[in-house]
């Protein structure tokens, strides 16, 4: 999916959250994450980790981000064990080969995948 297609999918998927007066803004990022975070008045960056292999890269990125802006903290959230193997690349590949990915993506995302691959 293009960046704009991904933004539209996410916006559609979080509609119910925004109805609860949450303050979620989905936007394209260009440039440095620390600059974007500062421009948004953010004080932390939340990153997800699936496996130990993700940690090394994220740890290095956190170190660089700290050097660029020490006022912004990074928080890591671990996925549940049952979802630790899921990645967008695996989902796209399984879907292209005709596999059922409905347990891994939203209904809206599945519809968009079906349209894209038909």
Where are these predicted regions, by residue range?
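Nucleotidyltransferase catalytic core that binds NTPs
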Residues: 1-118
